[in-house]
Amino acid sequence: MKPTRNNVLTVSVLSLMLLGCGGDSSGDSSGSTVINGVTYKLTFKSDWNTTNFPTNYPSGSAHFSPLIGMTHNASASLFSTGKLATSGVEIVAEAGSTNSIKSEIGNIQNLGFSQSLIEGGDLPNGQTQVEVTFSLDEDFSLVSVITMVAPSPDWFVGVDSLNLFQNGQWVDELVVELKTYDAGTDDGVSFTSGNADTSPKENITLLTSAASDTDFSNGVHRSSGQHIGTFTFKRQ
C-alpha cells in the first residue's frame, strides 16, 4: 500500500514583516540556546475526525504522538518523499516514540547542521490543538517537525525543511495544510491493521489507500480534498 509520489505541501504565506508580535504558548521546545534569534509558536490543529474522514475512523483511540523535530540548515533533512525513512522516523510513524529520532537529531547537531531540538506535546483523543514554541536564527532558518497519525501502520504528518526566513525577512505567519505520509515500513492497510513489516523497506510517499480502507488518496481526502490538519507558524 504505497502511494503515488508527490512532494507538494500547500503553504499559505499570510504576511511578511520585520517585527512580530508577542504571545503565549502551552509548550516550550528544548535544545540549544539561540543567540540573536527569533521565537516562533507552532500550533498544530487537527481536522481528523469521523465527520471529515469517516472510513474506518478509529473512534475512541484517534490521536497524534508528541511533536518532534529540529531547526537546521540546508545540509540536513528529517524526511523526504521518494527516500527511505530513517530508523527514527520509522519508529515515530509506527509507534509514536521519539527517543530514536532525538538521538538522530543529536547526531545532526554534532555535525553542526542543526541548532535546536523541537519537542512538543501530543494531541490526545478528543483534543484538536497543541502548541510549542522554539527559537532559530538566520544560519538555521529551516524547520522540520513530524507526528504520528495514531493508531496507524506507519503514517505520519509533518513538514521538512520549511524556511521561515524568506527574501531577507522573517515570515510573520505561515500556515501549512498537512498531507499524510506513508513511511514505507509497514504493509498495513487501515488504521488498526496488525503489524506487517515491509521487506524490503520502501520510500516515503503520500498516503493512498483503497477506498474501503481509508479516505486518503495522495495524502488528503480522496473526494473532498480535506487535509488532516494544519501547522501554523507565528513569530512571537
Tell what function each PLM region has.
Residues 33-39, 47-157:
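Structured domain cores in non-transmembrane regions
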Residues 23-26, 184-236:
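Activation corresponds to long, low-complexity, non-globular regions
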Residues 146, 153-201:
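An exposed acidic His-Trp-rich patch
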Residues 18-36:
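Bacterial Sec-dependent N-terminal signal peptides
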Residues 11-17:
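Bacterial N-terminal signal peptides
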Residues 1-9:
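Bacterial N-terminal signal peptides that target proteins for export
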